[in-house]
């Protein structure tokens, strides 16, 4: 077969395809990919209120500890360890992802913790908070709070958004309020020859070693402490198919 004869079937097929396209109606013609118009969102809203309470820890021993925990872990880890009275603990995460099918993508974590008009009495109380050999060799976002005592507030927040869209936002808002609380810390000598004093011990030992990513660790002993670990990440393109884009992170 001559080369000219071998090309004839291909030429005929291309000509036929072009003829069909020429006869197609307006609705059947090729159209560009439409710009993203939707919205993808992940939101966490959380409220914790401790109000008008009375806590009496007389000669009480409060021990809060994390020993050999959260090591060799990956991803998002939130741990709260508390011992005592009137403590508030919370972990919140808002994660969203979109592959170019939305114009606006955002993740929001909005947290409110309130401790108000409470009465805390510590007489001869011992509070020990210890983080020992924990969160080692971990990667990702790790938030650890350890508290011993009364009226402590603990919080771990995470807001992450990844998208191909033109508008990307990640926001995390944490509000911790301690208002009009009464704390009484004094030695206790009742039924004892020697007074027993209030003791607060907070320790961090051999923890968070060889870890990568965002690591937040809080250790507190006593009364009325407020602890928070927050991470916000926003990742998107600056020039997308939908037009000029933007990245926002709060």
From Swiss-Prot:
Any one GO CC term of the record: extracellular region
Sequence segments annotated as region (Linker 1): 96-126
UniProt KW keywords: Amyloid, Cell adhesion, Fimbrium, Repeat, Secreted, Signal
Motif (Cys-X-X-Cys): 237-240
Function: The major functional amyloid subunit in this bacterium. Intrinsically disordered in its monomeric state. Upon overexpression of the endogenous six-gene locus (fapA-fapF) in situ, cells form large clumps during liquid growth, make large amounts of biofilm and produce amyloid fibrils. Expression of the 6 gene operon in E.coli strain BL21(DE3) induces flocculation and biofilm formation with copious extracellular fibrils.
Domain notes: Each of the three repeats is modeled as a beta-hairpin; the repeats and inserts are modeled to stack on top of each other, overall forming a beta-helix. Soluble monomeric FapC is predominantly disordered.
Protein name: Functional amyloid subunit FapC
